[in-house]
Amino acid sequence: MKLLLSKPRGFCAGVERAIETVEKALLLWGSPIYVKHEIVHNRHVVQGLKTKGAIFIEDVEDVPVGARLIYSAHGVSPAVREQAKKRQLIEIDATCGLVTRVHSAVKRYALQGYQIILIGHHNHVEIIGTAGEAPDVTTIVESVEDVKNLNFSSQDKLFYITQTTLSLDDVKEITQALIVKYPHVETLPSSSICYATTNRQMALREITDLTDLVLVVGDPQSSNSNRLREAASTRGIESYLINDEKEIHPEWLLGKQVIGLTAGASTPEEIVQKCIQCLIELGVNEVEDIVYTHEDVVFQLPKPIVNARFSVD
């Protein structure tokens, strides 16, 4: 039985920056450090940071006045930032730079009088934060059916933008429907789907046609991990989303010749390696890397972390 490893996979630059932000904050100022929402959507990462002293909260009111609060990679709305200021919290922003780009675009176009069409999943924390930049003029669209139900006129100035972790195929269908209905709709010159989401989906496509089973290592809450599993499934390949090696079912491998393995952008490589070892113990006797592209993107740590490190040095 052969195992094909999709590359790139696992951590992206935004996730690495967010995790390092929490770790460095704990080293610089000690516990507790408060984090708004899970820093990234992966239970192994979150649990590891909890044991080091990070406290994850959903409501800013749960943070003691004057404490340090880190914003997760998914971003937050201006209302959350205002709430933090009222509590005199020391804010450390670990929002992914690519999410910040989307926030900035929504704010800019809203100020210019546009109606914002935000393509994404209604309940995802990234979408909640982005929509909060201009809640009165933002409409969230999740499907082609949602596009059909839009009631804008040809006189309305329209701008669309997407959640950074969506399926390339889904976005293509939705944007095509949007452009057909509203030919005058505007968007950014380049896609707002992040490079890592795109690379992981394209890398997976390189192996799906060669496999009879695809395993995606990622948390059920992780949007990009779910989109990876869907990408394989829509191509008719049996596929499963697993948290770690403990969720691999031996019966999945019965009769299989080639297995594909990838991981979402918030999945640690050590978890992937445990999954590989488990598959070897279950009968895999050949492992091959299939490389789509190499990534060398690095995002600078938030200024409060950088400045504190320099002052300590």
Curated annotation (Swiss-Prot):
Isopentenyl diphosphate binds at H41, H74, H124, S222, S223, N224, S266. InterPro entries: LytB/IspH. Its EC number is 1.17.7.4. It comes from Protochlamydia amoebophila (strain UWE25). Dimethylallyl diphosphate binds at H41, H74, H124, S222, S223, N224, S266. The active site is at E126. GO terms for biological process: dimethylallyl diphosphate biosynthetic process; isopentenyl diphosphate biosynthetic process, methylerythritol 4-phosphate pathway; terpenoid biosynthetic process. The keyword Cell inner membrane does not apply. Belongs to the IspH family. This is 4-hydroxy-3-methylbut-2-enyl diphosphate reductase. The gene is ispH.
